[in-house]
Amino acid sequence: NSNFHATADRGNNILFCSYTPSGGTFTVWKANGVNEKPQKYIEYKTGTNIRFGWKISIQGDLDANALITTPVFQKDSKVQFARWRVVNGVLQTQDPEFVIMSSSLLTSNWIKWADVIYTDDTDTQSDYFLASHVTDTSAKRYFYWFKGTDNSIKAANTGAPGNTIINAVDYAVFNKVPYVIYNQVNSFNYAVTGSDAVRMYDLSSGSFDNQIVVCPDKIYGGLENSGQNTEGTGDVVFKAAKNGYYLYVYLVFSNGGIACYQYDCIDM
């Protein structure tokens, strides 16, 4: 369980987190680039009936300012995540703050598949996004945009079938335009080959109205194991080029493929 998930910031830092079942110590290691030996960065005793570590995300740069988030399961039977703040390159505390999301979401479906990321690297009241298997009163799975001021739902996309797992998200601003991306997978044994997909949105209108096609569905997911993504997992990552010309989208699916797509700001 010492290396369950990895993520990177907007600089050159990488975080590795442990999966921590009830009563364990949630540990996060930090490395400055792929050639540096990881060092312990966060150690937090979780207590009983709490699970940490299925996912971890960073908004910002750990050498400057950042917000670190990880979903929390089975704590007080609420839909919530843990948050750490980094200010001027300094982690503010080993103990996280807990953020409780909209009570309209059904906690019975708040299980291991989830990811959370903020839109700002310093403002804890900025908006954030939730990729998860949680539902509201319907049977569908939705990708949620939350208002950070009161942790209520600001917007939800049109939804995916109930057996779909939405479990990874990333957010970036490219040439002053905000973008969000998430994945959706199917871990069940009746999943057809390539059932996994990626969704990306231009958020400049303040809604999910402007979807951008990243790639055709049914070409990268579930290539092995008879088309089954057993863990129901994958990842999506934005990376903007330093020269401002290109935005790269990276995607990966368990038992599936790895791909990179390039977008530019050139108007032909």
Describe each region flagged by the PLM.
Residues 9, 16-20, 70-75, 130-136, ...:
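Conserved beta-strand positions in repeat-built beta-propeller and related beta-rich domains
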Residues 231-268:
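Blade-level signature of beta-propeller repeat domains, shared across WD40, Kelch, NHL, RCC1
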Residues 29-36, 82-91, 145-153, 200-208, ...:
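Short loop/turn segments immediately following beta-strands, especially the blade-tip
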Residues 166-201:
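Loop/turn-rich, solvent-exposed surfaces of beta-rich toroidal or solenoidal domains
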Residues 22-30, 75-84, 136-145, 187-200, ...:
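Structural motif
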Residues 2-9, 48-60, 105-119, 162-176, ...:
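Repeated scaffold domains used in trafficking and secretory/extracellular systems
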Residues 12-16, 62-70, 122-130, 177-181, ...:
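Entry beta-strands of beta-propeller and related beta-repeat scaffolds
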Residues 1, 37-46, 92-103, 153-161, ...:
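Beta-propeller fold detector
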